[in-house]
UniProtKB/Swiss-Prot annotation:
Superkingdom of the source species: Bacteria
Subunit structure: Homodimer.
GO annotations of cellular component type: cytosol
Family matches, as PANTHER family: TYROSINE--TRNA LIGASE, MITOCHONDRIAL, TYROSYL-TRNA SYNTHETASE
Protein name: Tyrosine--tRNA ligase
Keyword Nucleotide-binding: yes
Amino acid sequence: MHKVLTELRDREILKDISNEEKFLSLPKNSGVYVGFDPTADSLHLGNYVQIVNLIRFKKHNWNALAVLGGATGMIGDPSFRSTERVLLSTEELLKNKNKIKSQLESFGLKVFDNYEIYKDISFLDFLKNIGKLINVSYMLAKDSVKDRLAQGLSFTEFSYQIIQGYDFLHLYQNQDIFVQYGGSDQWGNITTGIEMISKVVGDNHKAIAITANLLTDSNGNKFGKSTGGGNLWLDAQKTKPFDMYQFLINQPDSEVEKLLKWLTFLEISEIKDLVNKHNKNPKDRLAQKALAYEVIKDIHGKSAAENCTFLSEMLFNLSLDLSKVTLENMEFAYNQIESFEVEKGVNLVNFLVENKILQSKRLAREFIASKSLKFNYEPIDEDFSVSSNYFEGKYATLHLGKKKILICKVK
């Protein structure tokens, strides 16, 4: 049992544990769970931190369970929020649940929907049998609740911690789940579950709360937001893998070792060696490249990670050997960065101007004069007609100046 705790400490992830002595005495194959509310139709990079840690438990032979918040998602967690969440419609919640369940299962995790606990419990039975297990004064003492009282807190949101707490009791009694794990902002909700368990089972219960430090960026904001402030989604249709790759490869040197420890399964010794090599020549961004590759590989697969690595090189290497680039690389690139379709044989400069890819022929001539208008890395002139000798004639690269590259699909 101690091995997973040692790993969480070595990776500087562990924040709090309610009773370490009790944790170390738990039987083999004990269960641990993390909750994921279906507030959107995809999980995001911030959620991925907890997915990775749940997988760490699984690798250490724990019975790891992802709890899908079909019930809690109907209410919305008020913890440390300044405003009440907008409630989801039944149809939207169902759609979100199905997609998130598939995402969690894609990581090899077992998934349990907490709606199954409550679907046959009447409101009066809930008050009679569950509500009596917790005191209002105990709930009001939670920082996550106190912070909202001044702004107003509905009974709906106030009851969230009762449901999350009862989840823990139910899983403890029915599935031998003795540990609930979550971010440090979940401490109040998790310990509510332990309070309920102690009321039912007694003080000799085995329930443990474990929380992780919140992963933040260099500005102290929650990690996983794009430059524009939006979430970086795990769904490739919502966030392109290459956009996530670029986000990771642009992380500052001051953060990259922490991110390698938190977001990858590389051994600590590997990470230290990698960071030492990186520090000898930081401009090569060796650590950031490893971070981006590992995370994309674990989320989207090895092929996507290799294609992202290629695409990054293509964007920033002005002398790339196209003979080493595959058709699969180009098909991937076409769907990841700015691209367009063009018919074989047409005058390329005219096409670019007519389709507003270049603003004017004057600008085209400036690029041509500086040899920075390139088709498949070769400078072209104003009379060039589209034809690609690479990638089975189906794709080509187009450089507009020194910093912009597009992918052409040749029809």
